[in-house]
């Protein structure tokens, strides 16, 4: 069976600003609007389709697997933007990165309150 994630909808109060935020942090470009969405396509073909809502937004979590070099670049953008970041999903280790499974990882939030994460090794893939 060949099943792949194609896209997910990301709720935002300002879809353009939220899509641009993700694109800027990851070094990507938003795609042209498609219906009510502003998609941001990541290199494996999956799109995060930003859609505006007036209601409350329940924060979701989106984790991105990146290379060691890309981690350095993205982490620099996070720091340059003055974003708060954490080594853990509970926000107990502010200003730190983690080294889970022999890699590096960090959590931060987008303007809509969604939890974003960059990791260099999939969790459960190596040494703790």
What is each residue range found by the language model?
Residues 1-16, 61-62, 122-128:
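N-terminal beta-strand motif that seeds the catalytic metal site of vicinal oxygen chelate
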Residues 2, 9-48, 52-55:
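Core segments of cupin and vicinal oxygen chelate
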Residues 2-4, 55-59, 99-100:
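Short glycine-enriched loop/turn motifs at secondary-structure junctions
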Residues 6, 36, 60, 102-104:
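Residue-level marker for the onset of beta-strands and adjacent loop->beta junctions
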Residues 18, 22, 62, 78:
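Hydrophobic pocket/interface hotspot
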Residues 22, 75, 120:
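Short, flexible helix/strand-to-coil boundary loops that buttress conserved ligand/catalytic motifs
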Residues 48-51, 107, 116-119:
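Conserved beta-strand in the GNAT
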Residues 64-111, 115, 123-127:
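Vicinal oxygen chelate
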């Amino acid at each position: 069976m060949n099943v792949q994630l194609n896209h997910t909808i990301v709720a935002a109060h300002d879809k353009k600003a939220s899509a641009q935020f993700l694109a800027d942090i990851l070094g990507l470009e938003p795609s042209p609007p498609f219906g009510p969405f502003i998609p941001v396509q990541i290199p494996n073909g999956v799109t995060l389709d930003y859609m505006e809502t007036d209601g409350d937004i329940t924060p979701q979590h989106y984790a991105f697997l990146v290379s060691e070099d890309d981690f350095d670049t993205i982490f620099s953008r996070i720091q340059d933007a003055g974003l708060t970041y954490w080594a853990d999903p509970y926000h107990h280790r502010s200003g730190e990165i983690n080294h889970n499974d022999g890699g590096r990882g960090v959590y931060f939030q987008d303007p809509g309150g969604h939890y974003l994460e960059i990791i260099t090794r999939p969790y459960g893939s190596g040494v703790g």
